[in-house]
Amino acid sequence: MKLDDLLGEYYELEQQLADPAVHADQAQARTLAKRYSQLTPIVATYRELNRVESDIETAQELAAEDPSFADEAKQLAAQREELVQRLRTLLIPRDPNDDKDVILEVKAGEGGEESALFASDLVRMYLRYAERQGWKTEIISATHSDLGGYKDITIAIKNRGTVEPGQGVWHRLKFEGGVHRVQRVPVTESQGRIHTSAVGVLVLPEAEEIEVEINESDLRIDVYRSSGPGGQSVNTTDSAVRITHLPTGIVVSCQNEKSQLQNKEQALRVLRARLLAEAQAAAEAEAAAERRSQVRTVDRSERVRTYNFPENRISDHRVGYKAYNLDQVLDGELDGVIQALVDADTKERLEAAQQ
């Protein structure tokens, strides 16, 4: 969308939000306010750019009579370039999911018990990062291994309050999907040999009910008895729920809640996120067939990152990021690697927008 169109949309939204009648429909008012907040940084930067350009003209006129104003004109010109670059960045087409909450799934892969133990390390890393960001977290379902690791776990991570541009859960975590590889000496290794294991991470934008309609007739719902670590029975009732979405074959299970109804609601929540992700992936694939892809898509089956314990090194293979602070990263200090991924994505989006 062109800048003039965005400015027109902003001023129209400003008028709509000033109308008390609009706020009678709270859902509509929230939608309008959200869009207004997205456009506000663009308009503010545009206004600042206009002010600086006006100041440049004045400084140049004064410099023609008094050379002492030449330095001020140069400083203003540099400021204008910064504002132009900022405006270009703000005009990059946004990921429509950037303000969404996230469903994050971590699954042990090759490596057996060691993989499950590393899965628990990754879960702790994401929970600590969420805590640092002030996000809310909720464990939806989990299956433990014999040594207390995770065979699989599903977590909801939610924004808290108003989402600042570039700080939303999806915006920060969307590149975490893929295969995470660990190189270390497992606790089960008696001879001190380094093993390589892998854990799969899937990150989905959480879907609202109005975004994904699920027909009960498309579901097969099975109930069974919940189990804990090592197959221990969690309770004596059939409260665990497994939902199969027949049209797609997607299967979601949940056993963490005490009641069958609660487990069903949580499973449906995960199912909605998976269906939304599948629909968006299909739409992106269709669009890519008609035009060159404007943004890189991450193959969630590829190896994206390696955690090397002997060297205290973390490497992200997509952007060539490397740092020797693995202990800090696993304690939730993820901003370095995440920002490298966000910056690479922003650069590609900017280049695509200029084509």
From Swiss-Prot:
Disulfide bonds: none annotated. Keywords: Cytoplasm, Methylation, Protein biosynthesis. The modification N5-methylglutamine is found at residue 232. Coiled coil: none annotated. One of its GO terms (molecular function) is translation release factor activity, codon specific. One of its GO terms (cellular component) is cytoplasm. Methylated by PrmC. Methylation increases the termination efficiency of RF1. Belongs to the prokaryotic/mitochondrial release factor family. Peptide chain release factor 1 directs the termination of translation in response to the peptide chain termination codons UAG and UAA. HAMAP family: Rel_fac_1. PANTHER family: LD18447P. This is Peptide chain release factor 1. The lineage of its organism: Bacteria, Bacillati, Actinomycetota, Actinomycetes, Streptosporangiales. The gene is prfA.
